[in-house]
């Protein structure tokens, strides 16, 4: 059988106490707050935001500089052996990006007899044994001397894969 025992518990009453307003203020002043760390967190967050903005700006500058480059495709969309465009004009110092558009191996060689006087063809040409084999592979060059430059793809020159760039 279960037995129940009863115990008397006294609960104190606080109804007769008076509060002191000065004590409240001093108690509030002693409460530690985390506001001393907030500026540090804000600075870290601001630096993080600044870093993200800086990276985005740098990426935009890189993309913009690539957008200003002239692109010449090595191989036509229909599979033809051609530079597209085969003739172009650029400003001195402007970047020309030759991009393999097909799966055929191509290169870019400037004809030493068909470039402005004083320009070294070996410094602006790909070595004839080097090839851009896969679609999307690129070769970039900047031509500084004004004049007309004729170029060709050494494996496909006999098939008419030649081009010309005029530097103004």
UniProtKB/Swiss-Prot annotation:
Coiled-coil residue windows: none
Highest taxon listed in the record's lineage: Eukaryota
Entry's localization field: Plastid, Chloroplast thylakoid membrane
Keyword Transit peptide: yes
Electron transport among keywords: yes
GO cellular component, one term: chloroplast thylakoid lumen
Keywords, comma-separated and alphabetical: Chloroplast, Copper, Electron transport, Membrane, Metal-binding, Plastid, Thylakoid, Transit peptide, Transport
Cofactor(s), names only, from the UniProt record: Cu(2+)
Transmembrane segments: none
Binding locations of Cu cation: 106, 153, 156, 161
Family the entry assigns: Belongs to the plastocyanin family.
Entry protein name: Plastocyanin, chloroplastic
Organism whose genome encodes this protein: Pisum sativum
Gene designation per UniProt: PETE
């Amino acid at each position: 059988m279960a037995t129940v025992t009863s115990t008397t518990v006294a609960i104190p009453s606080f109804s007769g106490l008076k509060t002191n307003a000065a004590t409240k203020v001093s108690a509030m002043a002693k409460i530690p707050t985390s506001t001393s760390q907030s500026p540090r967190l804000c600075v870290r967050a601001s630096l993080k935001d600044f870093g993200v903005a800086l990276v985005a700006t740098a990426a935009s500058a890189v993309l913009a500089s690539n957008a200003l480059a002239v692109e010449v495709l090595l191989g036509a969309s229909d599979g033809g052996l051609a530079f597209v465009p085969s003739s172009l004009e650029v400003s001195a110092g402007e970047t020309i990006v030759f991009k393999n558009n097909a799966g055929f191996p191509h290169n870019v060689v400037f004809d030493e007899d068909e470039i402005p006087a004083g320009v070294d063809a070996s410094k602006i040409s790909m070595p004839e044994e080097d090839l851009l084999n896969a679609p999307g592979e690129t070769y970039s060059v900047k031509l500084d001397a004004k004049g007309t430059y004729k170029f060709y793809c050494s494996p496909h020159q006999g098939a008419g894969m030649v081009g010309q760039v005029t530097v103004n």
